From Swiss-Prot:
Entry's family note: Belongs to the influenza type C/coronaviruses hemagglutinin-esterase family.
Catalytic activity of the protein: N-acetyl-9-O-acetylneuraminate + H2O = N-acetylneuraminate + acetate + H(+); N-acetyl-4-O-acetylneuraminate + H2O = N-acetylneuraminate + acetate + H(+)
Modification after translation: N-glycosylated in the RER.
SUPFAM superfamilies associated with the record: SGNH hydrolase, Viral protein domain
Disulfide bonds, paired cysteine numbers: 44-65, 113-162, 197-276, 205-249, 307-312, 347-371
Key word Cytoplasm present: no
Gene: HE
Species of the source: Bovine coronavirus (strain 98TXSF-110-ENT) (BCoV-ENT)
Record-given protein name: Hemagglutinin-esterase
Residue numbers annotated as active site: 40, 326, 329
Amino acid sequence: MFLLPRFVLVSCIIGSLGFDNPPTNVVSHLNGDWFLFGDSRSDCNHVVTTNPRNYSYMDLNPALCGSGKISSKAGNSIFRSFHFTDFYNYTGEGQQIIFYEGVNFTPYHAFKCTTSGSNDIWMQNKGLFYTQVYKNMAVYRSLTFVNVPYVYNGSAQSTALCKSGSLVLNNPAYIAREANFGDYYYKVEADFYLSGCDEYIVPLCIFNGKFLSNTKYYDDSQYYFNKDTGVIYGLNSTETITTGFDFNCHYLVLPSGNYLAISNELLLTVPTKAICLNKRKDFTPVQVVDSRWNNARQSDNMTAVACQPPYCYFRNSTTNYVGVYDINHGDAGFTSILSGLLYDSPCFSQQGVFRYDNVSSVWPLYPYGRCPTAADINTPDVPICVYDPLPIILLGILLGVAVIIIVVLLLYFMVDNGTRLHDA
């Protein structure tokens, strides 16, 4: 009887030998309620236009092309569409959201608003933008773009002040100076309206430095005032630098309502597009796949900076991106990461996706879903069995009862047999 607990424990450990359930470096989903946002590496429609049609252009398995769970556009990104005239209406909905885009706005594009501007500021903007997107898509099912209507009572029109190469900023819009103003020391306003969504991500941006125009330096100052609630959001230029600064953006999450955009100095800016967030859901971390070029082009790590637990899991390849279609399309490592979309998985964690929910040699960090448990028994290669102990306890009791019955029966027959021999 005293050997029984040891027997059960040894059997349990032996049963776990040879079984391993490590976290895998993939993105996956618990069930069919998922959605992917991407670019050319997951744009099935773009592949249709290649001649000849060649699915090696993508990192996405072509079996997913007809799933209806992908919103991707070659040459674009959510950040690029949010700020610039190069626009694609990313739209999708799901409990589990995956992002594999961002590479189409990197240091390789070298965007800056003016010739003396700074691309570093735009990389900072990119990181702040995706932080808001990832955080909010952990609690919202639906993402799309909406236009933001505004009313400006002056005669001046919006101006393309901020542009570089093929990229022209149109969100926020700049309202040009009125002809009767001799300089930029003036206050001006415009009404804008947010309606139809649960919440919105909108930009509030300023030139954070001394802006030079006709020998005069100006400090940018921009505010949004919610006329329904009385809440005001604002930014004022605080830097004294005259070169090397650019358009610093904050990304506000605002409710529906009537707003007033206010400029106290320099040009008035007003949002023209917003990320529309709809359908609140239970907290579900998003998954982000690193979006970068082959090393021949300069990339950034802003999506990694923006993707932090517990609201986001980041997946990356350990090697340089080397495509088979061309060096920037069809990489084996990233194809492997996306292959997890072909099947359901029970558990997600910071380390990766677990294929089974029973036992693992690795403790899941920031776990989500039905996750395995594990323990260290000072033998790194031997995971302890951590199944539900109740069945083992019951089995032990039954075995103990069986042993007692067998012993009693043996004693009974031995005594009975001895009595018979004595009587004979």
